[in-house]
Amino acid sequence: WIGVRGAASALYLHRQGIENVVPIGCPTMYSNFAGEILPSGIESPRDIAVPFHWSIAVNLLDELCDHRLIGQDVMDEELFLENKSARLSRNISEHLGISKNEAQSKLEYAVSSGGFFPESYQAWYQEIGNQKALLSGRLHAAICGLTQGVPTVLSSWDIRTREIVDYFKIPSASGEQIRKEGSLSAFMNADFEGFNERQNVCWGRWSEFLNQNNIANNSKVYDSSVGPFWNFKTELQNDNEILKTASYLKSENKSGQSRQINRALRVLKRGLKSTVRKTRL
């Protein structure tokens, strides 16, 4: 069996003639089971740290200085440690239609006020885990927050993050929502209940995926009530058949998104929702 992020990736591989491909999400999500996560005690933007990415900086620019900003990649390193903001300021100014000087001034002030760039992966991971809450523009920062039990909302901005949000039901907020409502409102309106309900199902699918591949597995389904009500082997097989069937359907327009494929994907999503309902029994 081959495991991929989500249904769109699985469908793409099926259409290339590759069989036994199923969605399992990101393996990093199975590094630690944190249990139920609730956004309690979040009272102001200062309670919410932001793993930095330019796309989220765009939507938080006017309140960016109210947040703890956590850098991650080489572009962040240039900004946080060397004060080289020209490239990011240009991106932000073009996106918002403001002057580069205004974007640069707000960006540099926010980073100087609350920016943190780690010396190592361990320092970065610890910093993520030490936060009261996270509004993340970074996928793996969000994952490492959730696996450490930190209430986390992910701002998805590409197919990669969208697939992970859909599969795990990660609490999420759109860039437009963050820009219009502000970080606190966007955070508090995110769906943590859906994520909490989905966790045991994802872990059950992961456990069965490893079992099907004869890979040693130290993880388990953390809610024992899941097992009697759902056969995860059958679920993986059903997903595989649905995606295989969908891969035979031809595109009906230039974008390659046919009505039949969309219907097949909706069927798959309904199956995932059905799994969640069964875990409630």
Protein language model features and the residues they cover:
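Active-site anion-handling motifs in enzyme catalytic cores
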Residues: 1-281
